[in-house]
Each structure stands twice: as C-alpha cells, then as structure tokens.
C-alpha cells in the first residue's frame, strides 16, 4: 500500500481517533464506487459490519449485494438509511449529476475496474478504468471529501508499454495530483474470486 499526503493509512487514522470503546461509532461517512466487483462487494461487507461507519453510499450501474458471509441484514441497513445505493451513468459523471451523493462524506473508496476482454476494446477499458475513476475522484475532491482509497494493481506504472499497468499507473498519478488530504493506493496481485469461469 502507498499513501500520499499522510503518514497513516485510513485504518491507522481510525485507530488514532478511536475513543477505545469498541461499541462506539466513529461516525465515518463513506462513498463506494465499484461495489459489485470482487473486491468491492467484500469492502461493502466490511464497511457495513464495522461500527466505525455511520453511513455508506454506493454508486453503481446496478445495485450491489452484500455477501452472506458478512452476516449483514442489507434490507435493514437500507431501511435505516445507513446504506444508500444510487444507480448512475458513469458516462455522465460530474458535480451536477452526482455531486449531491459525494457531498458530506469523509472518504471515497474506489474499487472500480474491468478487463480489456470484458470491456470489449482498449478504448472502452481505458474509459472505465481511468476516466470513470478519475471523474468520480474529481467530484469527490470538489465537494470536500478529504480521503481517497483506490484499489490499483501490482505493477501499476504510468510509463508501461502495456495497457493494464499503464492505465492503473495513470490513475494513481491523477489521484496524487488531485491533492486529497489523504490518498491511499493499494496494489494487490492476482484476485481469487473463489470460483472458476
């Protein structure tokens, strides 16, 4: 994991702010993009299972489902207003179209990503993995979200000759240049989705 503008990642920041009472919520408000993917659905489950988060907003093309292993009553979380999901058109991301969803949140989590094969072309892949992510981050920054946490990839490098690591590296550079108060970038290796395609 790499962090920018901070000596602490989000978990360390939470620990420093904690009162020590495990039953007391820190009241962190989070917005998550990419909650229907392999990492995103697990992150959504972790956020909802944590008492540290008082509100989780999810943006996506379709509604996300919390994996059963987290023991979260998704319907109850939605009814209480702690979990709010909004379907959005990622081709139309701007302050005007989604700014209200980002407003008043403390941290923007982004696990959005695809593959060239799934996207259908190099251009479509770049649009999803780069443009959608950076456009969402710009909105988050513009409305005052102080922290961004982005799931990139092992080997990300903006100067790479290869599409996937180059795109991920370009996103990392764009996020650093947006100058959030806290920028956390995670570079996992291969993902084990737990099933065979």
Regions found by a protein language model. Give the residues of each.
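Conserved SDR Rossmann-fold cofactor-binding beta-strand/turn motif
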Residues: 186-192
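NAD(P)-dependent short-chain dehydrogenase/reductase
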Residues: 193-197
């Amino acid at each position: 994991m790499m962090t920018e503008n901070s000596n602490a990642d989000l978990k360390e920041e939470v620990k420093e702010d904690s009162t020590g009472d495990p039953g007391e919520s820190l009241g962190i408000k989070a917005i998550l993009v990419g909650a229907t993917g392999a990492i995103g659905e697990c992150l959504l489950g972790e956020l909802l299972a944590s008492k540290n988060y008082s509100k989780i907003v999810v943006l996506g093309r379709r509604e996300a489902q919390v994996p059963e292993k987290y023991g979260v009553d998704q319907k109850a979380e939605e009814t209480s207003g702690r979990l709010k999901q909004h379907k959005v058109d990622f081709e139309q991301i701007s302050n005007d179209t989604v700014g209200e969803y980002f407003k008043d949140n403390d941290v923007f989590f982004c696990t959005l990503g695809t593959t060239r094969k799934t996207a259908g072309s190099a251009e479509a892949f770049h649009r999803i993995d780069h443009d959608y992510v950076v456009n969402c981050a710009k909105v988050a920054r513009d409305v005052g979200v102080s922290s961004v946490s982005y799931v990139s990839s092992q080997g990300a490098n903006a100067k790479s000759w290869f599409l996937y690591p180059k795109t991920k590296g370009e996103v990392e550079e764009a996020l650093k240049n947006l100058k959030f108060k806290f920028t956390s970038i995670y570079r996992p290796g291969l993902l084990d989705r737990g099933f065979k395609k």
